[in-house]
Structure formats: C-alpha cells, structure tokens
Amino acid sequence: MTQDELKRLVGQAAADYVIQNVPEGAVIGVGTGSTANCFIDALAAVKSRYRGAVSSSVATTERLKSHGIKVFDLNEIESLQVYVDGADEIDASGAMIKGGGGALTREKIVASVADTFVCIADGSKRVPVLGAFPLPIEVVPMARTAIGRRVTALGGVPVLRVTQDGAPYITDNGNEIIDVKGLQIVDPRGFEAQINAWPGVVTVGLFAERGANLCLLGTPNGVETIVYPG
C-alpha cells in the first residue's frame, strides 16, 4: 500500500471507531493534516449521526464545512468524548510529536478536553524514541531568538519555519514556529514541561502529558490497534 492508501485506511478505521463508540448526537473533535483529512472525508458519510465537530485549525474548519459538517466553537461545548488526529511521530507510550501542519496549539487545546485521544497514522510514524522529526515550538515572534538560544543550549538545532517566499510562517494564532532538529527525547513529559515553561513559548509540539489513548496504525497487513495504559 502507498502512504496515501494507508492514510485513507486509518481515516476510515477512525470513522468506524467513532460509529461504534460515540453515541449519536455527540460532537467530534477533529485534528489537522492529511491523515485527519482522510478521517473527515470518511466521517462525512455518517455526518447525520452527529451534531457536528470542534475543529483544530482554519484548514480543518474549511474541510468540515465543505462536507456540510457543522463546526462548533470549543467554548460552546460542555464535553468532548473523542478527538481524532494524526501524528508526526508516536512512541511506545503514546507520546507524540505533532505540529508539522502548524496547528499544534489548537490541537493541544482540543485534545486536552477530550475524554479519548485517537491517533491515526501510518506505520512509518511509530518510533522507539521521539525526535527524528523536527520538534515544532510555537512562539511569540519577539521571543523567537531567545528561545532559539535556549534550544541550542540543549543540543537542538532551531530552524525558523518559513513560507515558500521565505517569510516567517504565521500560525492561525498569529505566532511563529521554530522547528528543532537533532533531538533525542527520552523523557517526553519532562521535556514538554521544560519547554512550555519558557517565557514566549505558546506551546511545544510534544503531546506527552496528554498523549494518545489509542492508535489506529496503518500497516501493509491492515490496521493495527494499539491501546496505551493510563
């Protein structure tokens, strides 16, 4: 199977999971990125079962609306049973690196209020140690250089994310992103807490304190379901 085929496979598997485990009339939390898009496309077939969705980005909102799925502001929702999103990397504990699509802050906010985080990914995203994929940090623009120095002191290589024309990439929240290369993150929870404590950091793309509860992993042999303790 190609990577795109695996993404569609797990997108459908996530829709099936929602149908089986989330009651009709609920609101679904939806992530951002190419794999999350496959879930949205599969969810569209059963959209009449659910009130709608909470979106983690402008791009996801547009895709949901294009399928006729109602989008709620998180402030309108009292509870969220499930959040479905992809990952750039996921380890054996369910900790993830996320934010390759630039939506890490809103993804983390929506994930934090969901009862269950379902990660959907192809098998290449499963790693023994996080860090081969550059770690995104969303930063207030004026703190960019100071945070870069802190990252360098920890052994990382900070790279400002830019657009095709070389301008800084701007998030939906009006901030910038530093992508940190060269890390081996052996203590994801501790590293997440450390970076989040730096002034000027909006959030880091480590999802360890609130990791995945379940991963639907696309493999050449089908979908592997991994349940994480705790």
UniProtKB/Swiss-Prot annotation:
Q: In which pathway does it act?
A: Carbohydrate degradation; pentose phosphate pathway; D-ribose 5-phosphate from D-ribulose 5-phosphate (non-oxidative stage): step 1/1
A Pfam family annotated for this UniProt entry: Rib_5-P_isom_A
Asked whether the keyword Coiled coil is assigned, the reply is no
Q: Which InterPro entries match?
A: NagB/RpiA_transferase-like, Ribose5P_isomerase_typA_subgr, Ribose5P_isomerase_type_A
Q: Which biological processes are named by the entry's GO terms?
A: D-ribose metabolic process; pentose-phosphate shunt, non-oxidative branch
Name the UniProt key words of this record, in alphabetical order.
Isomerase
Q: What class of enzyme is it?
A: isomerase
Q: Name one GO cellular component term.
A: cytosol
Q: What is its EC number?
A: 5.3.1.6
Q: Which reaction does it catalyse?
A: aldehydo-D-ribose 5-phosphate = D-ribulose 5-phosphate
Gene Ontology molecular function: any one: ribose-5-phosphate isomerase activity
Q: Where is the active site?
A: E107
> Which positions are annotated as binding substrate?
T32, G33, S34, T35, D85, G86, A87, D88, K98, G99, G100, G101, K125
Tell me, in a sentence or two, what this protein's role is.
Catalyzes the reversible conversion of ribose-5-phosphate to ribulose 5-phosphate.
By sequence similarity, the record places it as follows: Belongs to the ribose 5-phosphate isomerase family.
Extract the PANTHER family matched here: RIBOSE-5-PHOSPHATE ISOMERASE
Assembly and binders: Homodimer.
HAMAP family, per database record: Rib_5P_isom_A
Protein name (record): Ribose-5-phosphate isomerase A
Source species of the chain:
Burkholderia ambifaria (strain MC40-6)
Q: What is the primary gene name for this protein?
A: rpiA
